[in-house]
Amino acid sequence: MNEELQQQYYQLEMYGQQVQKLQEELEKIELMKMELLKSIDSMEGLKDSEDILIPLGGGAFIKAKAMDTKKVIMGAGADVFLEKDISDVVVDFNKSIEDLDKAGSMIIAKIEETAKVAEQMQKDLEEKVQAMEGQMGGAPTLQM
C-alpha cells in the first residue's frame, strides 16, 4: 500500500508542477499584452518633430525627432521589414491582444481543471493515509 501512496503523492506533485508552469505561461501572456498596449499608446501619442529615444540595445538610446508619425516599420520575420500605417498596426496589435486573451482564458481553464483534479487526489490520498493509520495504529511513512 505504501508504494501506491507514493505513486499518488508523486502524481500530485506532477499536477502541482503543471499548474505552476501554466501560471508562468499566463504571466508571459500578460507581459506580451502589456507590451502591445504600451506600443499602441506610444504610436497613438506620437507627434511629428517630437523628441524620441531610439533603443540601440544594451540599455543604450539615441535622441531623435519623429519625422513621420503616420507610418511605422515593423519586423515581419527573417530580417524582413514592412512599412505600415499606424492605424493598421494598431488593428493588428489589438487582434494579437484578443488572441492572447483567448489563450489566457484557455490556460486559466486548464489551471482550474488541473487544480480540481489535484485537490480531489489530495483528499483521496489523505483518506487513504488516515485509513492506514487506523489499521496500523500509527502514521504510515511515505518513502521518497
UniProtKB/Swiss-Prot annotation:
Species name for this entry? Methanococcus aeolicus (strain ATCC BAA-1280 / DSM 17508 / OCM 812 / Nankai-3)
Role according to the record: Molecular chaperone capable of stabilizing a range of proteins. Seems to fulfill an ATP-independent, HSP70-like function in archaeal de novo protein folding.
InterPro entries referenced in this protein's UniProt entry, alphabetically: PFD_alpha_archaea (IPR011599), Prefoldin (IPR009053), Prefoldin_subunit_alpha (IPR004127)
Cell compartments where the protein resides = Cytoplasm
Assigned keywords, A-Z: Chaperone, Cytoplasm
Say yes or no: keyword Cytoplasm present.
yes
Biological process GO annotation list?
Answer: protein folding
| UniProt protein name | Prefoldin subunit alpha
Family named by the database record: Belongs to the prefoldin alpha subunit family.
